């Protein structure tokens, strides 16, 4: 299934039906009074969270969405039928904005949550409502009011506890495939991952959702490399795993420079992103060059006024993954129990479900 995380749609609520001008036509009552019924109310446009959905693909090609109009009133005091509501189902994590102003209208995260995003018009009153002692035969009725309409932008922000960030080809997809049952595309070239992947990781007697965020590059906060689309999905994450490639980065790159560059992009996009707890890990330490680079980064960050722990991990051998998951779990659940496994041992694949 294609992953679509932003769409623009037009919604139109139903118009209210017009009230009727009608008269009583009964035997032996030659001049019956007014009997025009009211028009029905127009249907609302409603957004509803469907936990079975994970993308906005349904709205990519169908942009116009209109609820039913209310029916007109009729004679014999008969009111028109209300128009049916139009229910648009969206995945959890959908943010709705007014396309014209950019104002955020709602943030939909709970299964079954419903929001009326465009209110239907009110049905007009029939002429029977306007009869009075001075006007016993009103020849007019009220028109229904038009339903609300607006252009909307729907943005999907993934609901994940942990986001894995880093440069392209830093090993994010390999890591998530090792610690969960997610099976992203993995290849030895940058930007293999073009859409976020989700996996559920079992940790002790708990679990948490991890998102593999496609690789970030310098300028991501300004949209470079689809940066806006990718960074959006980090906003809801409570903890970030910051992967740094230890082996053979491109010319001119080094682990410390990569770490600083990605952190600068997070800060430029949002102050909130910059403040999120981070677990730093150097990847591919099964390669001697990467292990040496990781040890060097450990020393550099360890000398800071507030030392930053650096994990050395290999998704290939499993080395360091137990300790990494413990650090993530403690950051999420505020637990401080020490890791009991021996350092450097291979990881038995954690019990997890995608």
Curated annotation (Swiss-Prot):
Keywords: Cytoplasm, GTP-binding, Hydrolase, Magnesium, Metal-binding, Nucleotide-binding. GO terms for cellular component: cytoplasm. Its main location: cytoplasm. InterPro entries: G_OBG, GTP-bd, GTP-bd_Obg/CgtA, GTP1-OBG_CS, GTP1_OBG_dom, GTP1_OBG_dom_sf, OBG_GTPase, P-loop_NTPase. It is found in: Cytoplasm. Its EC number is 3.6.5.-. Monomer. This is GTPase Obg. It comes from Anaeromyxobacter dehalogenans (strain 2CP-C). The gene is obg.
